[in-house]
């Protein structure tokens, strides 16, 4: 599902809201999550999961085409851990 499909589904489930308002709400939520991660904060949505950032140390990688060693610098990457309820929901009946 992409963002526009999410907006459409929410708008269909809430006919009293205009689609552009739903889109603004979804964009605002995503912007707040991104801003919190940018600050290094953790964003927890109970029952769904938690977004956080992790630091990856610098390392020596390899160029897959040439096989030559390449220095890969330190970086910060987003991380998502599913909540207990989400894990249970995904694994029910399997």
From Swiss-Prot:
GO terms for cellular component: chromosome; cytosol. Signal peptide: none annotated. Keywords: DNA recombination, DNA-binding, Transcription, Transcription regulation, Translation regulation. GO terms for molecular function: DNA binding; structural constituent of chromatin. InterPro entries: Hist_DNA-bd, Histone-like_DNA-bd_CS, IHF-like_DNA-bd_dom_sf, IHF_beta. One of its GO terms (biological process) is DNA recombination. Heterodimer of an alpha and a beta chain. This protein is one of the two subunits of integration host factor, a specific DNA-binding protein that functions in genetic recombination as well as in transcriptional and translational control. PANTHER family: DNA-BINDING PROTEIN HU, INTEGRATION HOST FACTOR SUBUNIT BETA. Belongs to the bacterial histone-like protein family. HAMAP family: IHF_beta. This is Integration host factor subunit beta. It comes from Xanthobacter autotrophicus (strain ATCC BAA-1158 / Py2).
